[in-house]
């Protein structure tokens, strides 16, 4: 059983949703980013999505675009992101880490090298936003052969004809993007999310995590009553942007994570 399967199974047995947190690797700098990464599990993160900085993050809103820029300016590379995961795994063997980003940096790095190094580092899954199922042979197939889950995004515009194709080779969990548009956009209604999850359940037994537009503990709790996972990214990344120092960024991100975790964990009581 993979770390992702194990984590979602444990939480299902506990009767609660997972808090899935997103931060960009190397933001605001390597050391502070590693501190945040290492601190997230104790602050209540059940699964961590770690963004791989790329110069053209087209699916991301302003907050994550700026985070990517800060990370790149601080010298973050894909090799350093893998190193960050290796350092995280020295002390934490249980929290799943999913790398999220775009195909171009992986293609430049070399797919076979990337898959081997990601597996060795302790990466559990990949979310590659610009690589549709038609291109599975390029990365999804070798990643899954190495034991790395390949997580698909579904959206309000993914119709019933397309959905089985998207979900066919998905593993780990399904990431439902509750709002059409870029990250950090407005949030979806409870009714919309309820209907969307019911539709997805007709096509897959995988855990369903819902993200985009979730910023507060109250919003996180509302989604946690419905979904297997609640994804929060832009709200955490904003804390880094607003911080006056790297130390403050670490403190503020972990503080918000704790508040979100409280919302998620209390949602079904």
From Swiss-Prot:
EC number of the protein: 4.2.1.20
Xref: CDD domains: Tryptophan_synthase_alpha
UniProt-recorded Gene Ontology molecular function terms: tryptophan synthase activity
Keywords: Amino-acid biosynthesis, Aromatic amino acid biosynthesis, Lyase, Tryptophan biosynthesis
Gene3D superfamilies referenced in this protein's UniProt entry, alphabetically: Aldolase class I (3.20.20.70)
GO cellular component: cytosol
Pathway per the UniProt entry: Amino-acid biosynthesis; L-tryptophan biosynthesis; L-tryptophan from chorismate: step 5/5
Active site: 49, 60
Catalytic activity line of the entry: (1S,2R)-1-C-(indol-3-yl)glycerol 3-phosphate + L-serine = D-glyceraldehyde 3-phosphate + L-tryptophan + H2O
A Pfam match: Trp_syntA
InterPro entries given in the database record: Aldolase_TIM, RibuloseP-bd_barrel, Trp_synthase_alpha_AS, Trp_synthase_suA
HAMAP family recorded: Trp_synth_alpha (MF_00131)
Family stated for the protein in its record: Belongs to the TrpA family.
Subunit comment: Tetramer of two alpha and two beta chains.
Function: The alpha subunit is responsible for the aldol cleavage of indoleglycerol phosphate to indole and glyceraldehyde 3-phosphate.
Listed name of the protein: Tryptophan synthase alpha chain
Species annotation: Pseudomonas putida (strain ATCC 700007 / DSM 6899 / JCM 31910 / BCRC 17059 / LMG 24140 / F1)
């Amino acid at each position: 059983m993979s770390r992702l399967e194990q984590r979602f199974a444990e939480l299902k047995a506990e009767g609660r949703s997972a808090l899935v947190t997103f931060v960009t690797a190397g933001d605001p700098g390597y050391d502070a980013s590693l501190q945040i990464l290492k601190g997230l599990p104790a602050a209540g993160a059940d699964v961590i999505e770690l963004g791989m900085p790329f110069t053209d993050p087209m699916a991301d809103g302003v907050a994550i675009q700026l985070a990517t820029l800060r990370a790149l300016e601080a010298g973050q590379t894909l090799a350093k992101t893998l190193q960050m995961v290796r350092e995280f795994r020295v002390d934490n063997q249980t929290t799943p880490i999913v790398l999220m980003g775009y195909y171009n940096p992986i293609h430049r790095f070399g797919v076979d090298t990337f898959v081997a190094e990601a597996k060795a580092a302790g990466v559990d899954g990949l979310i590659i936003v610009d690589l549709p199922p038609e291109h599975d042979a390029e990365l999804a197939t070798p990643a899954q052969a190495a034991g790395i889950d390949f997580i698909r995004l579904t959206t309000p515009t993914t119709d019933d004809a397309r959905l089985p194709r998207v979900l066919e080779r998905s593993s780990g969990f399904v990431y439902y993007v509750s709002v059409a548009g870029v990250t950090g956009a407005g949030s979806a209604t409870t009714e919309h999310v309820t209907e969307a999850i019911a539709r997805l359940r007709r096509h897959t037994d995988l855990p369903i995590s819902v993200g985009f537009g979730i910023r507060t503990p109250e919003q996180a709790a509302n989604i946690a009553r419905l979904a297997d996972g609640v994804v929060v990214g832009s709200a955490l990344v904003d804390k880094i942007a607003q911080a006056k120092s790297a130390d403050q960024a670490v403190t503020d991100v972990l503080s918000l994570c704790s508040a979100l975790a409280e919302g998620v964990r209390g949602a079904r009581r």
